[in-house]
């Protein structure tokens, strides 16, 4: 890439850091709309533009706990609790681990050194586990109603489930959805 463009990208990237409006990249396009349209498109993208994404801001921290959160559908999702770090202008100390498959893939354990980032500059995620102690146990009982849990496997993705239809988490979260703006708008 030409040094002039590299200098421009560096200047813009540094300017974005000071900008109060978040930006996750840059799109260059022709300023001649007629010429740009004449270039057409590929099967997915216009030929008159090119997009560049900034590297995600990544911070190292220490995993302190996994909180298991029951949902209205019965899924029990792992939430990573870690030492607070500054990411994209906010303090972050929690991130969804999504499901049992991701837990196992990351080989998480309490005290592990992990790298975290914000996906799309918004959603905290664990990028990698630097120590991989793999010592976290999957709960055998629902953290809310204490019913025996099961692991479902759909399309190769393992999820932890509370099968109890009377689980208080399911009832409370279903009621919360019912009275929400998207529900009855109460």
State where each predicted segment sits.
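RNA/tRNA-interacting regions in translation and RNA-turnover enzymes
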Residues: 1-186
